[in-house]
Amino acid sequence: MSTPQETQNQPEVDANVSEAGDGDSAFDAERFRSRAESTASITSSILEYRTIRGRTYQTSKTTEYWYRILDVGTGTGIWAIDIADKFPGAEVIGTDISPTQPSWVPPNLVFHIDDAQLDWTFEPESFDFIHVRYMQGAIDDWPKFYSQIFKFLKPGGWFQHMEPDIELRCDNPDVKVDDKHIFKRWAQLFYDAGDKLGRTFKFADGSMDKWASDSGFPQVTHKKFSIPYGGWSKDDNLKALGNYTGYYLDLSLDGFAVYPIGQVLGWTLEEVQVLVAQMRSAVHDPKNLTAGDMHLVYGQKPKST
């Protein structure tokens, strides 16, 4: 098991943001709305795949590609679209249980409506690269999931898996964060819900490394990145990243909490809304310098198995 390689540095704070009285200035929301609102709905022909015994079966293309890439849990398909644009000679497949992908996509990209927890129906050893991210709380059996990654990679193929640490932190040393702080309480509630569901939200404990190693990957690399939430950093790149992550989190907090905390832990809607409001306020508070860790694990299947 590898030790995470740290990439954290002491944050430099943009005074214009950190001294603002309204944390909203840390989130440049208008920049991202146009792209979100332009997302088209998925075509009816793709939706029809659900009627085939609840499974998706895609007709194989006859064109030969140099690379074959699988994006598991593709969501809106944004990563798959970007990678298909960047590598037009590759065949890219995105899978997700929900039909939230757009209809306008590069010609070398297809989406399958599929449940990644079931046995995958692709040809074994048929992908050069398998990409996974943001699947926290979505998988019952991670060892099985990783064994499928290994099974469907070609010899010499690579996988990459990225998950955020659900416990955010304050990068301001003057802010006290104890067990009563909303960042700690928020994370613990998700840990409790995950334990009850049998679907973990914990990815900072080296579990991804172990799953990969146990499935057959001989050498696994684990990198940990610190990312800001909000535009408080003085570094231009981190400021832009913080605006993206802050906006994404701002839109997602309600959706994150309703099922695991409301349905699984039995909180009322009003209680969940209060919790979300507290979390949103803390993330927006410029004094907190809100940040979090992103865990990236990757490895290569042996060229001969």
Locate the predicted segments by residue.
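Conserved beta-strand elements of beta-rich interaction domains across eukaryotes
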Residues: 56-57, 62-64, 74-77, 97-100, ...
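A short glycine-rich, Lys/Arg-flanked "PGG" loop and its adjoining helix->strand segment in the class I
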Residues: 143-160
